[in-house]
């Protein structure tokens, strides 16, 4: 994803980036408390298991970078499908040949896993599952054409969804339905070293654009939550600007749920930058109010998305179970508060 938006989506860009030194080492501004005041927390629903989510993240990385049109990508996709089926979901694969910024035909598969498929009231939980083909934000320019492992930027969001599906199957108490959607072809956007391409923002979130324009199910979810880079060290999740503009009520719902679950320190009320991400076409084309849970590293010069974003360092060594726990438990809080 990128931090500026194309007029295709009819939105004004407002990017908030603060540059200091590249000494953030995966930490957001200040120290993130791993627990909030117990007296004010009122958690509901089952307990999210961060160890399990961590293992799901590692399992995806074990295939290697899940770059479009690669064997690792295809093998991991089959694994994701089987895991969702194992946890009682009805799974559909939405396939399409999509065109990358450079004309490359991308064999895309959106994985749609429906928990409690008979339920009419449904919630969308989504993340992308492909890896960035180029580490074009790496401090070392010799790495710019190497693929990204995408432990955080890809695998972590899918891992949280898999653990949520596992918990929902075991708990058997949630009455609403959940559509878990793994978007493909999110990270084939124009690399920084490529020149001469117009409308570069359109080259991102291709799978989500296809999903939103070719909606695959009869019942649309009431609202949606996008999980993007939800396992990074020291992450905090500011209220993303496009989410505030397009789905303010859902933003309030999610950030209040974080406080109730005991993880408000990970979800400050500050507003971050406006991000071109999968939630934008879902809002604009599918009409589903959807918010983006995405980190905002205030004092990291390398990127406001954190020091590993689109680098060869986006590996398991920088995945934090505490961050996975905060996000996973917050989503459970949202679902069980309906």
Where are these regions (language model features)?
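C-terminal motif of bacterial Sec signal peptides marking the signal peptidase cleavage site
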Residues: 19-23
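Bacterial signal peptide processing site
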Residues: 25-28
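N-terminal capping segment at the start of a domain
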Residues: 30-76, 87, 301-318
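Second-shell loop/turn segments in exported
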Residues: 39-47, 62-71, 98-101, 143-155, ...
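Catalytic-core environment of secreted peptidases
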Residues: 50-56, 63, 87, 103, ...
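A non-catalytic alpha/beta surface segment that caps or lines the substrate-entry region
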Residues: 58-59, 65-118
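Active-site-adjacent substrate-binding region
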Residues: 95, 105, 223, 232-338
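Acidic/histidine-rich catalytic neighborhood of metal-dependent amide-processing enzymes
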Residues: 145-249, 274, 278
């Amino acid at each position: 994803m990128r931090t500026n938006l194309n007029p295709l989506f009819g939105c004004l860009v407002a990017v908030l980036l603060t540059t200091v030194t590249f000494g953030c080492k995966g930490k957001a501004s200040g120290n993130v408390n791993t627990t909030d005041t117990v007296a004010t927390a009122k958690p509901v629903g089952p307990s999210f298991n961060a160890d399990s989510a961590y293992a799901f993240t590692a399992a995806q990385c074990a295939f290697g970078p899940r770059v479009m049109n690669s064997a690792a990508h295809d093998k991991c996709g089959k694994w994701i499908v089987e895991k969702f089926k194992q946890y009682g979901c009805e799974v559909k694969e939405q396939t399409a040949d999509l065109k990358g910024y450079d004309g490359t035909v991308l064999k895309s598969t959106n994985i749609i896993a429906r928990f409690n498929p008979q339920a009419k009231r449904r919630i969308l939980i989504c993340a992308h599952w492909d890896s960035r083909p180029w580490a074009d934000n790496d401090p070392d320019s010799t790495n710019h054409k190497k693929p990204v492992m995408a432990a955080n930027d890809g695998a972590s969001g899918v891992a949280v969804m898999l653990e949520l599906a596992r918990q929902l199957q075991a708990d058997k108490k949630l009455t609403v339905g959940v559509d878990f959607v793994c978007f493909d072809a999110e990270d084939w956007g124009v690399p920084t070293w490529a020149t001469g391409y117009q409308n570069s923002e359109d080259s991102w979130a291709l799978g989500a654009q296809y999903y939103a324009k070719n909606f695959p199910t009869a019942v649309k979810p009431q609202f949606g939550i996008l999980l993007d880079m939800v396992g990074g060290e020291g992450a905090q999740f500011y209220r993303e600007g496009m989410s505030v503009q397009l789905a303010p009520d859902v933003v309030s719902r999610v950030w209040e749920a974080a406080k109730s679950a005991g993880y408000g320190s990970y979800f400050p009320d500050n507003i971050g930058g406006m991000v071109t991400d999968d939630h934008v076409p879902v809002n604009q084309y599918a009409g589903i109010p959807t918010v983006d849970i995405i980190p905002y590293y205030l004092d990291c010069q390398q990127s406001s998305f954190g020091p590993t974003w689109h680098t060869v360092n986006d590996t398991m060594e920088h995945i934090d179970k505490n961050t996975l726990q905060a996000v996973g438990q917050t989503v459970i809080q949202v679902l069980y508060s309906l």
